[in-house]
């Protein structure tokens, strides 16, 4: 569960390394987000000479969470870190590569480009 002020690792090569959540999108009283939810974030750490710099406000989609996700078949999945992929204004990934595994719930939410770029889908 990702709430406001949560930190997220960046799972792509957009230039950001660490994000802090400003807002979980989708409703005025939305408390938390999970895999596949879009969040507004501030860049807290970035690579030198990258497209993004510290302080930039970006949209991102959550791709991994430490809190387990319950699937319709009754199974659960959880990851070792909280991670997100930075999005552009068309909700497409800003980077050209995705690092680490992603949850298959992204396919159901319509983020096919991220699923196709990911090395593993769980």
From Swiss-Prot:
Keywords: Ribonucleoprotein, Ribosomal protein, RNA-binding, rRNA-binding. The keyword Endoplasmic reticulum does not apply. GO terms for molecular function: large ribosomal subunit rRNA binding; structural constituent of ribosome. One of its GO terms (cellular component) is cytosolic large ribosomal subunit. GO terms for biological process: translation. The keyword Ribonucleoprotein applies. It comes from the Bacteria. Pfam families: Ribosomal_L14. Binds to 23S rRNA. Forms part of two intersubunit bridges in the 70S ribosome. Belongs to the universal ribosomal protein uL14 family. Part of the 50S ribosomal subunit. Forms a cluster with proteins L3 and L19. In the 70S ribosome, L14 and L19 interact and together make contacts with the 16S rRNA in bridges B5 and B8. PANTHER family: 50S/60S RIBOSOMAL PROTEIN L14/L23, LARGE RIBOSOMAL SUBUNIT PROTEIN UL14M. This is Large ribosomal subunit protein uL14. It comes from Thermosipho melanesiensis (strain DSM 12029 / CIP 104789 / BI429). The lineage of its organism: Bacteria, Thermotogati, Thermotogota, Thermotogae, Thermotogales.
